[in-house]
Amino acid sequence: MFNFFAAAPKGFEYSLANELTEFGATDVKESVAGVYFSSSLELAYRITLWTRLASRIVVVIYKGPCESPEQLYNAAYCIDWPSHFSNKKTFSIDFHGTGGFINNTQFGALKIKDAVVDRFRDDGDARPNVERVDAEFRVDAHYRNGQLTISVNFSGPSLHQRGYRSTTGEAPLKENLAANMLVRSGWQAEQVDLLDPFCGSGTVLIEAALMACDIAPGLKRQRFGFESWRQHNATMWNKVLEEAHARASLGRTRCKVKFYGSDIDPRMVSLAKRNAENAGVDELIEFSEMDALNVKVPCETGFMISNPPYGERLGNITELLQLYYQFGDKLKQDFGGWKVAMLCSDVELISSLKLKADKQMKMFNGALECAFNLYTLHANSTRRDAPVLPEGVDDIADIAPAFANRIKKNVKTLGKWAKKEGIDSYRLYDADLPEYNVAIDKYVDYVVIQEYSAPATIPEAVTKRRLSDVLLALPNALGIHPDKITLKTRERQKGTNQYQKLAEKKLEIITQEYGAKFKLNLTGYLDTGLFLDHRVTRKLVGEKAKGRKVLNLFSYTGSASVHAALGGAKSVTTVDMSNTYISWAKENFELNGINLKNHEFVQADCLQWVDDCREQFDLIFIDPPTFSNSKRMEDSWDVQRDHVALLGKLIKLLSPKGELIFSNNKRKFKMDIEALTALGATVNNIDELCLPLDYKRNPHIHNVWLLTHGK
């Protein structure tokens, strides 16, 4: 008898232990991310070929205490390595675990490697060569809490690699995870007709077909670790292989189960067909290109098991919420009598099915924790799960009716106003209803949602549900497609995170404002490139700019500079610390047909630039951040603490009849008028003048002040 460890993803332990017991293994004991067991060599071959759940199987050749580098070396040296592999084979050490005297896994691997080659040398043999990437013989070592385990990799490359996958899609599902879904859902025991309406590359259906046809999942594999192990019995292994081939041939002829798969992506359907052909089960599975919302019921009753798209995989969250909600309707209306199992990492998405789960489990898709929910759909029932939707809600149009009505009202009122003003981007909703605590901005034909932090007294589950309701209700209320809606989450600003880049993918559009055009990026950054609350302030800058030298400090994307230039400024100097925003400002100038020759764009630490500046300006606009401690700045910046010092310097750069417009977004900002007056400035608050209609609900969104030289 040999002692083994079968490794598997976290959460597989229970299923794997049952599988090993059914194979006939003894001393089966669950551990973290795997199961220990004992078996004969022949049974070990059979388990390695037939396991649908294990990722790797190793045969344990040493287990004992280890408290020092010397003990580690001696434990490895005492193993009779020449009896395990030939010195003509390349080898490698996979070491896992740290602690105590082992600071890193490389140290542990090196110690064992030294012991192995020394043992060969002392036995009179030439040393074997190390091959880290693709060694013929692999040693597996684990160190934990002073205990060392050394094993031989019996199975070879990861067992989830069955050998039938041509390539993967954007979000592949590992084969042993698909198999565990089939086991834990109860399908493997029942083996009835199976449908996957989000089939992707076909993994769930192919694994199910292999089960139904009694085909060993390892039959297509080209390589096993034990083939380089000197205790390998080729005759015994060939017997196990022949038995598996015979079972597969018989199983294909006896299989009565029907399999149906569909996907909206034709590329994935083609890939699924190729994979099924490679696995030898293509004649059993009917694949089609189809939107899951249009999928037909293939038979009276059956199982649906699927891994639908979710945030970490594919798609816009608003589109996905709509998809899940509508798919839940589809299930209730058309699939009465069916059993359904869904894998999803996003609790809010799977909750949007609005179905009551019979059972909820956790599984890991790689490092991603997922919910695996089982449902029984009752025939002729369209009733939704009452606790999730308000009483009487049966249609998506009835979700958050007060919110939807407010949106429609605001669109009607603000839409007319915006058209009259000559703008096509504005704040549509600003936490008008306290329970729906979001800001919604309309940018041309697109919508951006930002969620405000909820009070600590409101449970997280409630805030998540309300946000889901907003995302579900908004497309219907606005009459737009969900892909026109973007959700952004705002966190407390910390240093350089003020304008943190969010994604490589860009959604760029052009907006118009009082005759000016601006480029927006709705997805690349937390902010879009245009602060809508400063719209009137920018207009004021343009109105005051004619014939004047203008300075725009902390310029962001230069929108105020554009208004100044269009307003007839003699010259505009645009200063910002970010190269990205200076380039963006130039693009905005070019978009408006403004010749850059008379205007200056400066990438610099704004505070240092002011200290070094010797020019004078007739109009200065400054809208600094509330706080910043960027690595590129000499000092940190706090608008409350530092505004007097900065404004005092800027007053000196102001021509005798010049004007300075100072704005910031600090909620409880207190302007030190007394100190500025002492520096020779006249200070007037112009908040009301600069507050647009779409921000009247939030009058403290910013502070705006007009400074001139004292009389």
Swiss-Prot record:
Superkingdom classification of source: Bacteria
Entry GO terms, CC: cytoplasm
Broad class of where this protein is predominantly found: cytoplasm
EC primary class: transferase
Catalysed conversion reaction: guanosine(2445) in 23S rRNA + S-adenosyl-L-methionine = N(2)-methylguanosine(2445) in 23S rRNA + S-adenosyl-L-homocysteine + H(+); guanosine(2069) in 23S rRNA + S-adenosyl-L-methionine = N(2)-methylguanosine(2069) in 23S rRNA + S-adenosyl-L-homocysteine + H(+)
PROSITE patterns, per database record: THUMP, UPF0020
Enzyme Commission designation: 2.1.1.173, 2.1.1.264
Keyword Transferase: yes
Pfam families: Methyltrans_SAM (PF10672), RlmL_1st (PF22020), THUMP (PF02926), UPF0020 (PF01170)
Protein's cellular compartments: Cytoplasm
Location of the THUMP domain: 43-154
GO molecular function per UniProt: 23S rRNA (guanine(2445)-N(2))-methyltransferase activity; RNA binding; rRNA (guanine-N7-)-methyltransferase activity
Keywords of this entry: Cytoplasm, Methyltransferase, RNA-binding, rRNA processing, S-adenosyl-L-methionine, Transferase
Role of this protein: Specifically methylates the guanine in position 2445 (m2G2445) and the guanine in position 2069 (m7G2069) of 23S rRNA.
Family, similarity comment: Belongs to the methyltransferase superfamily. RlmKL family.
HAMAP family in UniProt: 23SrRNA_methyltr_KL
Protein name (Swiss-Prot/TrEMBL): Ribosomal RNA large subunit methyltransferase K/L
UniProt source species: Shewanella denitrificans (strain OS217 / ATCC BAA-1090 / DSM 15013)
Source organism phylogeny: Bacteria, Pseudomonadati, Pseudomonadota, Gammaproteobacteria, Alteromonadales
